């Protein structure tokens, strides 16, 4: 049997399909998720059910979003009423419609690596209705997500996600845990949205800001990583007094803490507004 065939299904490159087959890894992920009977659990890209099976051993029902039409029919036949299958592209899916008052969503998935960053930004739009997210991603992406200022991995993805989520690198996953095996190492990340105060402000280590303005600032700052910020952000001098706010333009973009980028965005953009997807 060819290496890209698993349980009679041919993995499709255009969908970024790599099926998880290692039972030890699978149960490690499920234990990290720790599903409870009353959870509103949503899986993105369930594939052949590697995570779906053990999750449904612990909870009575769940929902999935699957793009591959062949797998949609297969999942419906296999799980029946215990699994509500939403056929469609997660990048365009409205996760708000799955929210239940008082029961925020728990979203999980082995995400296609070719769309992981756009999907993470898309999901930011629904963070107010999410309790947590557990995703399998390319290890390099997870390292960028949780990176600290001053490291080579620290960049736009780190800043934009850390403003909205507490994140934790949960476990590493080798290529051999998949069929077909990807060419890169993988990892699982836990993402917990920062809650809000009663007035709508985020209870984040960083001040709230206009996410669209922050995205523009960070994109400009990292447009020339090897140069200091005097070369990339000096065009903003007419709008903000960098010296007065103690923002040193002699640093490189990766040396600036998240909070300083947020404060710069606040001074440029005023009150928080905008959708996360606009910052992508």
Curated annotation (Swiss-Prot):
What is stated as this protein's family in its record? Belongs to the class I-like SAM-binding methyltransferase superfamily. rRNA adenine N(6)-methyltransferase family. RsmA subfamily.
In the UniProt record, does the keyword Secreted occur?
Answer: no
Q: Which InterPro entries match?
A: KsgA/Erm, rRNA_Ade_diMease-like_C, rRNA_Ade_Mease_Trfase_CS, rRNA_Ade_methylase_Trfase_N, rRNA_adenine_dimethylase, SAM-dependent_MTases_sf
The molecule here is called Ribosomal RNA small subunit methyltransferase A
Q: What is its EC number?
A: 2.1.1.182
Which positions make up the signal peptide?
A: none
GO MF annotations, alphabetized? 16S rRNA (adenine(1518)-N(6)/adenine(1519)-N(6))-dimethyltransferase activity; RNA binding
Which PANTHER family has this protein been placed in? DIMETHYLADENOSINE TRANSFERASE, DIMETHYLADENOSINE TRANSFERASE-RELATED
A Pfam match is RrnaAD
Organism domain of life: Bacteria
Organism of this sequence? Cupriavidus necator (strain ATCC 17699 / DSM 428 / KCTC 22496 / NCIMB 10442 / H16 / Stanier 337) (Ralstonia eutropha)
Q: State where the protein is found.
A: Cytoplasm
Report whether Aminoacyl-tRNA synthetase shows up as a keyword of the record: no
List of residues binding S-adenosyl-L-methionine? 18, 20, 45, 66, 89, 110
Keywords in alphabetical order, please: Cytoplasm, Methyltransferase, RNA-binding, rRNA processing, S-adenosyl-L-methionine, Transferase
């Amino acid at each position: 049997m060819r290496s890209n065939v698993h349980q009679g299904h041919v993995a499709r490159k255009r969908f970024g399909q790599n099926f998880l087959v290692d039972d030890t890894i699978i149960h490690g992920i499920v234990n990290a998720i720790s599903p409870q009977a009353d959870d509103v659990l949503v899986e993105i890209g369930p594939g052949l059910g590697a995570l779906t099976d053990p999750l449904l051993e612990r909870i009575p029902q769940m929902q999935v979003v699957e793009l591959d039409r062949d797998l949609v029919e297969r999942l419906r036949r296999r799980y029946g009423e215990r699994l509500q299958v939403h056929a469609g592209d997660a990048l365009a899916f409205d996760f708000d419609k799955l929210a239940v008052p008082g029961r925020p969503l728990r979203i999980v998935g082995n995400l296609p690596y070719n769309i992981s960053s756009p999907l993470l930004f898309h999901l930011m739009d629904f963070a107010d209705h999410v309790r947590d997210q557990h995703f399998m991603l390319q290890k390099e992406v997870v390292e960028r997500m949780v990176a600290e200022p001053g490291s080579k991995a620290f960049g736009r993805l780190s800043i934009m996600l850390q403003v909205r989520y507490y994140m934790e690198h949960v476990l590493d996953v080798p290529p051999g845990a998949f069929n077909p095996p990807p060419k890169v190492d993988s990892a699982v990340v836990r993402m917990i949205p920062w809650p809000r105060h009663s007035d709508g402000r985020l209870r984040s280590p960083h001040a709230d800001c206009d996410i669209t303005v922050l995205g523009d600032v960070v994109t400009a700052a990292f447009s020339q990583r090897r140069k200091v910020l005097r070369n990339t952000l000096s065009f903003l001098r007419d709008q903000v007094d960098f010296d007065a706010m103690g923002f040193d333009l002699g640093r490189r973009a990766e040396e600036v803490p998240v909070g300083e980028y947020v404060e710069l965005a606040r001074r440029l953009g005023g009150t928080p507004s905008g959708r996360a997807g606009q910052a992508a």
